[in-house]
């Protein structure tokens, strides 16, 4: 369980956390993760602490407390816990002990407040441990993670996220420029070449540009104050949701040229498309829960797994749609063998686009995940750079393949389906 939490928990968006734990019986709670490369500090304040004993003896205050665990010490702690199932992690020499409940002020305050400097650069995980079986803990917790700049000001972003505000802003400018260029092409091109999909594609660019712009604002505000601005955060989530839904919509519509919406005969296949979007909506709900909470909630790991599962199913559904569209077009064009131009072997565009989409899914879902797993914590921004670069290149390739040209291969295929 410890390894699962550490692997799935990203560094927080807001590095000032205020949370309430109520009647929690978990033996270990991951509060937050943070990576330091300089003068790191962790500030912890607990209040209104109460411990309720289970069926056993009275809880021992020294068996409840907070500690920091670096990634380098994770393996050693796991070995200790495997060798002795009753081992209390607070007794481990590989953890950085902060304080136990023995340090709390007498009731009714039952509080503690202290700031700890961290000398060794590393990525740390803040844990709360309860080594009293069957006892439940309630408390109010306030944590702050920050590094001190040379002028004494605080930097609340982890070292691996320090470049994210500039990175997101740069990609936002690129998407706005791409949008302006596409609108210019639509304006100067022959309007008879415009299809409905060409009006939907710039909506994707606009939503993506705005989501990145507000993501940069969220990170910038979190870096200065330790918390994300509520308006920027909500706006980012809205535009991020719209951009994800539009991306899947455009990919499916472009990849099948709306042939799956062909009436009556293909009614059963239309259902599949209307399953993809609800799956993405549910996946985004899971993303909002993960984004706005933290690993301290009891179902946090479950929400992460739901997010990954729904996104994976959505990608598989899109790939299935493409395979079905290719089979449909092969069957339709086989009836038009009298015209050499109708031979499916000469229509390579849909096959190429299928490979492009498959490569995009593999790189953004699996490649980025592997990169985030193996990369050092101070270079976490590289995984964001890779993901945004792949997405931008994918959009450029998709827009180029289905640009405004007269009688491209895809238009001919669309006419065949409509006439059929």
Predicted feature descriptions by range:
Residues 44, 124-126, 183, 255, ...:
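Structural signal for hydrophobic/aromatic residues that build the beta-strand cores
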Residues 227-420:
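Generic detector of multi-pass transmembrane helix bundles and their immediately adjacent loops
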